[in-house]
Each structure stands twice: as C-alpha cells, then as structure tokens.
C-alpha cells in the first residue's frame, strides 16, 4: 500500500499535530483537505505544501457545526472525487480542578472533543459505507486511559473518543463496510493545547511537565502515516505515543 494519491481530510490542521501530519502526508503524495477555524494559518500551510510540489486545499471549519463537517466532505469529493481517510484531530484541553467550576470550559471540551468527532464521523460515514472502504483516525489522549487531578472533564471527553472509535470498528466489522479505525493516545506533545488552560495552578504544573518531557508533534504524524500506509485488510486500531522519559 501507499499514501500517494490518497485523499485525506485533517481537522485541527492549523497547528501542532494536524499541521505536522499535513506536511508529512503531503510529502508522501497524499491529496489533502485541511480544516480549522484559523484560515490564515491554513493558507500558509497550503502554500508551503504547494511550494514543495504537494497538493492541498483548505476550508474554514468549526467542527462543532454539523454543516461545516458535511461541507468539508463535499468539498473533498467535489475536488478529488472521493475521500480515503479522515483524521479527526481538533481538540482543546483547558484543564482545571472540578472545584474551580469552569462550566463554560467543560461545555467547550464536550462540544469540540466529543461532538466534533461525532460530527466528523457522521459527515464521512455515508461515503465510506457506499464505497465499502475508508479510514477514520482520531486523536484521543493518554488522559483517556489514565486519570489525573485537573483532567476530569478533558479525560472524560477523550475516554468518549476511545469508546466511539472502538464501537465504530466493531460495528463496521459486523456490517461488512470495511471501515478501519485508528485511535491515537498522545502523552506530552508540544502543541498549543496548553494555551487553552486558564487555571493558573494547573497551567503552571502542565507547563513544567511539558518542558521536562514534551516531544515534537511530528512524532505523532509519523504514526498517522504508518497507519494509513497499512494494507486494506490490516487495522492497527490503537497507538499510545509519548516521550520515552515520561513516567506515565
């Protein structure tokens, strides 16, 4: 199998893991449809890809809106005739103790981290079912595997992603739709996630952790590329990825 000429949608593509994955997949010959809310950043990434003889387009997308997700898939099909894979990567991590009662941030995490993934699945599933193939990749987190103080709501949203993706894999196998799923559980990866934390004590603790252990997002990009490059009859459905030096 090869990544070359595969049509791949990436959400949360304007920075961090999404950006790193876009650049790597473009280098390997994929045709990309990049999605995020920050259009100016998407424009620069697409310019970089095209300057290196790659192929990519972009669309301003709010993953919390069903119509934005549907239009994203429609754009990919209109431009390239199909969708082979979608990387549901958009997410936020405004961690805080439950006692801080940051209810607005709780809702934002639920909307982006859970509903955003559901909206992406709903948008692409009809095409994947019709063509009896497709690859759905989602960014969860080690927080979806291991609880820690300050990460209650974030961890809950990432556990939800884990469950959604596993059930999707099981149902696809039962229904014979040949849809593969991959769930990635990153640990300390140096992205913009920490910028979403408003609780000072939590922000200081997480910043210290990431400064000590954090690795670059291209490490996750290589995992995404590896998964997409597998034969159609192989589903490598889970990856936990973190710094060698990080104890958890």
UniProtKB/Swiss-Prot annotation:
Coiled coil: none annotated. This is Uncharacterized oxidoreductase Lmo0432. Belongs to the short-chain dehydrogenases/reductases (SDR) family. PROSITE patterns: ADH_SHORT. NADP(+) binds at residues 9-33. Its EC number is 1.-.-.-. InterPro entries: NAD(P)-bd_dom_sf, Sc_DH/Rdtase_CS, SDR_fam. SUPFAM superfamilies: NAD(P)-binding Rossmann-fold domains (SSF51735). It comes from the Bacteria. Keywords: Oxidoreductase. It is an enzyme of class 1 (oxidoreductase). CDD domains: SDR_c. Substrate binds at residue 141. The active site is at residue 154. GO terms for molecular function: oxidoreductase activity.
